[in-house]
Amino acid sequence: MGKRDRVDRDKKKSKKRQYEEEEEDEDDAPGNESQEAVPSAAGKQVDESSTKVDEYGAKDYRQQMPLKGDHTSRPLWVAPDGHIFLEAFSPVYKYAQDFLVAIAEPVCRPTHVHEYKLTAYSLYAAVSVGLQTSDITEYLRKLSKTGVPDGIIQFIKLCTVSYGKVKLVLKHNRYFVESSHPDVIQHLLQDPVIRECRLRNAEGEATELITETFTSKSAISKTVEGSGGASTSQGVDAQAKSDIPKDLFDFYEQMDKDEEEEEETQTVSFEVKQEMIEELQKRCICLEYPLLAEYDFRNDSLNPDINIDLKPTAVLRPYQEKSLRKMFGNGRARSGVIVLPCGAGKSLVGVTAACTVRKRCLVLGNSAVSVEQWKAQFKMWSTIDDSQICRFTSDAKDKPIGCSIAISTYSMLGHTTKRSWEAERVMEWLKTQEWGLMILDEVHTIPAKMFRRVLTIVQAHCKLGLTATLVREDDKIVDLNFLIGPKLYEANWMELQNNGYIAKVQCAEVWCPMSPEFYREYVAIKTKKRILLYTMNPNKFRACQFLIKFHERRNDKIIVFADNVFALKEYAIRLNKPYIYGPTSQGERMQILQNFKHNPKINTIFISKVGDTSFDLPEANVLIQISSHGGSRRQEAQRLGRVLRAKKGMVAEEYNAFFYSLVSQDTQEMAYSTKRQRFLVDQGYSFKVITKLAGMEEEELAFSTKEEQQQLLQKVLAATDLDAEEEVVAGEFGSRSGQASRRFGTMSSLSGADDTVYMEYHSSRNKASTKHVHPLFKRFRK
């Protein structure tokens, strides 16, 4: 009986250990499950009960989806389960893609056929940018090769019938509930809670309903014509027109006219009490009429305009302009999220939004480096004076008096423990300001509870979230829909690559065989030290060294990523390269990065997970990954983004950037690697598997002898379980440093003999090494 209990305990430990290794760093701590109120329709799924399934599990839609006579000219298949398939080779692909990005979530976008999925949140986003229920169903019917299933029509109506019909608008610093549907306003006013929120005059009577005519015209003027995606009126030549059904072509002509024309809408509104806004929002959600927040910044006379404009040199690319038109489509500022690939110019989108609103702006990033980069971006693209920009980080606390643009980090605002006197004064100032725009960089990294704390500390009329990867390994990404707003725009990575807006990257997975000694220990050890064994695999080290030598001879700029600090230091020191990790000071970080950018002698740097986001290194064109965080899809995409910026002078080659992921064969790392690649594969990237690096035997590389490999193994075995853990970045949300944890240890650890290894060295060799000056210090420029 005792033996069985022991086996059960070992199984539980193994499962727990596996869970901890796979776990994502963005997860909230236990007990943070409090959810924002969401409409019940948001939980609905498309009904698939009538779909036939054959003996192999394949779905048979032939009876439900008869083809139209001219189906070859139409680009869409709409399946009864909500999945939509788009032919990328269709002459009307541009039109159909613009529409699908607005109403559905991209699932997979390879070369020829793209897959999308209708969800409640994607339909909410469609309504928020002005599409009506009838528009969505009519567009789908005209684009589809078959009839649109009745279940899909019902699902669209269910999700869009009430969303977007009621708006919360701030005008002249007074809040109004506004709708173009008078019957909806009357329905809301019948509710006692909403009647209580309505503003009353001095006599205690409710204020009158206000009827006005609202002219909607985009606040972003079209400056780019016919250049790949800014308008639906481009991209179809005369020959292709003959292949398009007449009803489809006429419909698109009408779409273009509707987009260009000013639209007059009659609205009905009533004023509400400012102190009851939160209660009003919750009640409207319960009534299935969630409020859509809009900021009428042009008519906000109480908040002063700031002196900021785009410089004449700032030219928006078509996709950047398109994303901003979604945000400012009706002359007001909508809150929401814009998704653009790393290196595609998210910062310029944020700066342009601030220049359009022209009210006080708060920018939040996730590190002190990103704060410095945002300041540089504002000075590069806008006419803002340096004295108008205020930074608030642990290292830099500028005086906020008279500033118009404040830049800080999430951890600085979400900090709950005692602050210094100076920091407390700045926080008080941030809290008392009424911000016109809040820009939230890398918005996917913020857990819901932390986010809610940041949102309650500062008040902003409009919130713009920017990210490259709207994915998380938990389900908390949907919280952003109601904490910030719907997704306004998402770009196609492959399309931007083909148009030259981002680099063309060759992705490769390099398989490194485990040396016999290392693999023997890997199989025997059951603690977290296994991670250290497959990361410090001598063959992986040799592959990394070979790739660095190969690309340095080509004058490439190389970044090597390692999540494990022990491995990071070992690799960097052995290869004589500079490295950046958590404890590296801000000054030293900037010095290393500046040398990497401008010093021709520094072509390789090692970075821990602190460099996953917000490190702006446009010169880098080679990335080597030696260790990573489990199966995180987000981290893989963020790291690829470090080399995605468009490269100058490298157009002749087929590929002008390289992404290598080094994986130890026959270990857990291979399973993690497959999981990590899912997001990039869905974006259209393919990974080349390299089992042998040509020319590696001819190079002089480290750990080429059994003795050297044995010494490395002894060093790894002498390391603690703490060394095997990943770096915990200060201020990173989701870090579990505050929780109790259990680690396996030995008696030698308790006696202080943890790092002791018996090794012999020749005395004369030691004396010679003391006189040697490290060449790295000669190469660095101060």
Swiss-Prot record:
Activation and inhibition: Phosphorylation on Ser-751 by CK2 controls the 5'-excision activity of ERCC1-XPF endonuclease; phosphorylated protein inhibits the excision activity and thus NER. ATPase activity is stimulated by TFIIH subunit p52 (GTF2H4). DNA translocase activity by this subunit in TFIIH is stimulated by XPA, ERCC5/XPG and XFP plus ERCC1.
Coiled coil: none
Gene3D superfamilies linked: P-loop containing nucleotide triphosphate hydrolases
Gene Ontology MF terms: 3'-5' DNA helicase activity; ATP binding; ATP hydrolysis activity; DNA binding; promoter-specific chromatin binding
GO biological process: apoptotic process; DNA repair; DNA topological change; embryonic organ development; hair cell differentiation; nucleotide-excision repair; positive regulation of apoptotic process; protein localization
Motif window: DEVH box: 442-445
Catalytic activity: Couples ATP hydrolysis with the unwinding of duplex DNA by translocating in the 3'-5' direction; ATP + H2O = ADP + phosphate + H(+)
Modifications after synthesis and translation: Phosphorylation on Ser-751 by CK2 controls the 5'-excision activity of ERCC1-XPF endonuclease; phosphorylated protein inhibits the excision activity and thus NER. Dephosphorylation reactivates the 5'-excision step. Phosphorylation has no effect on transcription or the 3'-5' helicase activity.
Pfam family, one: ERCC3_RAD25_C
GO cellular component, one term: transcription factor TFIID complex
Location within or outside the cell: Nucleus
Compositional bias annotation for Basic and acidic residues: 1-11
Region Disordered, residue ranges: 1-52
Motif interval(s): Nuclear localization signal: 6-18
EC number: 5.6.2.4
Annotated Helicase ATP-binding domain residues: 328-489
Phosphoserine modified-residue sites: S34, S686, S751
PROSITE patterns attached to this UniProt entry: HELICASE_ATP_BIND_1, HELICASE_CTER
Domain Helicase C-terminal: 543-703
Composition bias type Acidic residues, residue spans: 20-30
EC class (word): isomerase
UniProt entry keywords in alphabetical sequence: ATP-binding, DNA damage, DNA repair, DNA-binding, Helicase, Hydrolase, Isomerase, Nucleotide-binding, Nucleus, Phosphoprotein, Transcription, Transcription regulation
Subunit field text: Component of the 7-subunit TFIIH core complex composed of XPB/ERCC3, XPD/ERCC2, GTF2H1, GTF2H2, GTF2H3, GTF2H4 and GTF2H5, which is active in NER. The core complex associates with the 3-subunit CDK-activating kinase (CAK) module composed of CCNH/cyclin H, CDK7 and MNAT1 to form the 10-subunit holoenzyme (holo-TFIIH) active in transcription. Interacts with PUF60. Interacts with ATF7IP. Interacts with KAT2A; leading to KAT2A recruitment to promoters and acetylation of histones.
Family statement drawn from the similarity comment of this UniProt entry: Belongs to the helicase family. RAD25/XPB subfamily.
Function according to Swiss-Prot or TrEMBL: ATP-dependent 3'-5' DNA helicase/translocase; binds dsDNA rather than ssDNA, unzipping it in a translocase rather than classical helicase activity. Component of the general transcription and DNA repair factor IIH (TFIIH) core complex. When complexed to CDK-activating kinase (CAK), involved in RNA transcription by RNA polymerase II. The ATPase activity of XPB/ERCC3, but not its helicase activity, is required for DNA opening; it may wrap around the damaged DNA wedging it open, causing localized melting and twisting that allows XPD/ERCC2 helicase to anchor.
Protein name (record): General transcription and DNA repair factor IIH helicase/translocase subunit XPB
Organism (species): Rattus norvegicus
Lineage: Eukaryota, Metazoa, Chordata, Craniata, Vertebrata
The encoding gene: Ercc3
